[in-house]
Amino acid sequence: MGKKGGTLKRSSKSTKTRKDIVEDQYDDEIDAFHKQRDIVPLDVNDDTDESDEDDVQPVFDLQGVDDESEEDEDTEDEEEAENGLTAKMIRQKKYLRAKFGDGDDEMADDDKDKEEDKRSTWGGRSGLYHSGDNVDFDILSSDDEDIKAEEEEVIRLRAEQLGSITAADAGLDDDSEEDSDRELTMEEISDKGKQATKSITDKKEKGDKDTHVEEIKKDINSLSKEEQMDVVYSSAPEIVGLLSELNDAVEELESKINPVMNKLKEGEISLNGLARYLEVKQLLLLTYCQSITFYLLLKSEGQPIRDHPVLARLVEIKSLLDKIKELDEELPPGFEESLARSIANGAVQKVVKEDQLTSPVSDSVDRITQDTAKPMKIDNAREEKKKKGEKRKHQNDLVDVQSEEMLKLRAALEGKLRTNGVLGSTVSKSDKAQKRQKLANRKLETFDDYVDDADNSTHNVTADKLTKLVSTKRKPKTISGDDDLPQRDDIGERRRKFELRVLAGAGVKSSEGDGRNKNGAFASDDEDDNDGDNNDMVDNDGESEDEFYKQVKQKQQAKRAAKAEIYSRKPHLMPSSPEHVDGKRHISNQMVSNRGLTRQRNRDLKNPRKKYRKNYEKKVTRRKGQVRDIRKQTGPYAGEARGINPNTSRSIRM
C-alpha cells in the first residue's frame, strides 16, 4: 500500500518579509496613521482593540459641547427599550418620579456632587499640557472663543474655592472667641435679640412661604420697670443687691461717721476708746464703696468680671463689715443718741464762739449789755463747771492710781525747777506782757496803734479781754537811720571792761572792784553801757596802763601756780620692810628640805623658748652650706670675695 500523500498545514499567521520590516522602521507616525486608515477590518463586530477616543482625556469638562449628541443617543436607547419589559420599567420609573420627586432630587444632588468633584480635580496631570500635537499657530489663533471660555471657567472655579475657605481655616477665629468671652451690655443683648428674631423669621419664611410670621422688636427704654428689672435679674442678678448696699454705706458715712470724725479731728468731741473703732469702720465703708463702683464700671463697659480680683475684694470687705456689725451690737445702747447730742452741742458751741469773735467791741455796748448778760453768763459758767466735773470723773476712772502719783511727782519736780530758775523764769506772763522793749529814739516812734495799748483801769476789763482775743499786737513803726543805732563806748574801753570781768571771775581782785553786779552775776556789755556813770567796778579818774599790765601778770602767775599744784608730782618713797632684831626673816622648813634637789642645768636648755631658738639658728647655718644666698648687685663687679674655686660648677646641666 502506498502512503497517502498529506498536505502541509500552513499557519494562518502572516509572515512579514524583510522589506516590510525595513519599511516599518522608517515609517513616521503620519505614515502609520494613513496605512491604518487604508486597512479594512474583516471582523466588523470585533471591538477588542481600544479606540482612539478612549485615549482622549478632557482637560476642561466644559458643558454644552457634547450634550446634544449624548441626548440623541439617550433618546434612541429609550425608544429601543420601550419594547418589552424594559418599556414597562421605564414608564413605572417616570410615574414614580412624577408622583414623589424625591428620588429625582437625590439623584440630581448626587450628579451635582460628582460634577463638582470633577471640576475640582481638573488638570491633575501636568504632562497633558506639554508636547502637544497642535503646532499649527493658525489653528490656535482661530480658537479665541475656546480660550476665553477656559479662562472664565478657571476664574469661576477659583472663586468657588476661595468662597469655601472660612475664617477658621485662615486662623482668624481669635477675635470671635474673645467676643464670645466678653460679657455683653444691655444694648448688645437687645440687638442680638433683634437679630435672632430676624433670623428665625427668615428661616420660617424660607421653609414655609405660605405662613406669615410677625417680627417682634423689643426696646428696653420702652419697657416697664418690672420688665426692665426682669432683664437685669436675668443678665446680672447681683447688681441690685450691690446697689442697695452701696446706698446704705454712703448714707451711713454721710449721716453718722463723717460728722463724728470731723468733730474728733477738730477736738470738739473726745472719745477715748471708740475713736480707733470709728476710723476702722470709716476706712472699710470707703473701700467697700470704691470696690462696688469699680465693679459697676467694669459691668457697664462690658468687660469680663468672672475671674476679676474685685470679686474677691468685695467678699473680703463684706466679711469684715459683718464682724464690725457684731461689734456694733456690743456697744452701749445709748451710744448713738449720745453721739447725736454731742454733735448738736458742738455745732451750737461753734456758732456761739463765732458770734463772740465777730461781734464789735466797744465800751458803750459792754456797759449797756453787762447787766442783762449776767444771768446768761452765770448759767453758762454753771454748765461749764458741770461738764468739767463730769470730764474729771471720767478721767479719774480711766487713769490708774500709779499714773496719778507719777503726775504728782512730776508736777512737784517742775515746781522746784521753776523756783531754782532751771526750767523757766519765775516772772509771770502778766509781768512780761506789761514790759515792752523801749527804743533808743522814742521821738521817732509813731503812735498810730494806740488802740492796742490797753489801759489798766478796772472798769474796762471785758473790753481788754476781747481785745487780747481779737486783735494782734503790732510792732511800733520807726523811721530807719543812724538815730536807731544804740550809743556804745569805744572798743578799747569795752575791751578793758571785759578783761576786768575775766580777772574778777578768775579770783584776782583788782583795785577797781569785783566786776560783779548786785545779784552776783557778771555784768554784760549792754548793762555796762546802760549804767554809765553808776558803775562801781571801773574807776575812770586815775588808772594807768602799767597797773593794768601788772594785774595781767599777777593773773598769769596765779594761774601757773594753780596748775603747778594740780599737775605737780611729789616723790613718794616706799618705806622698806621693817627689819627684825635677828635680821631678815628666815625661810620655811619646806624650802630648806627642798634645797639641793634640782640639778644644775644649762642656761640655753632649761628655757624651752631659748632652746628652740638655738636649734633654729643651727639649722639656718647648716642651710647656708647647702644653698647659697642670693646676693643683689650693689655696684660694679669687684671680684670674688672668697676667691674662685675651679672645682665648683654653678651652671645648670641641660
From Swiss-Prot:
A motif (Nuclear localization signal 1) lies at residues 2-9. GO terms for biological process: chromatin organization; rRNA processing. Mainly present in tissues undergoing rapid cellular growth and differentiation. Mostly expressed in shoots and flowers, and, to a lower extent, in leaves, siliques, roots and seedlings. Residues 44-56, 64-82, 103-114, 171-181, 524-546 have a biased composition (Acidic residues). Residues 182-212, 364-387 have a biased composition (Basic and acidic residues). Keywords: Chromatin regulator, Coiled coil, Nucleus, Phosphoprotein, Ribonucleoprotein, RNA-binding. InterPro entries: Sas10/Utp3/C1D, Sas10_C_dom. The keyword RNA-binding applies. It comes from the Eukaryota. A motif (Nuclear localization signal 2) lies at residues 608-615. The keyword DNA repair does not apply. Residues 140-160, 243-263 form a coiled coil. Residues 1-23, 35-145, 164-212, 362-397, 470-492, 509-654 are annotated as: Disordered. Interacts with NUCL1, NUCL2, JMJ14, NOF1 and MPP10 in the nucleus. 'Thallo' is the Greek goddess of buds and shoots. This is Protein THALLO.
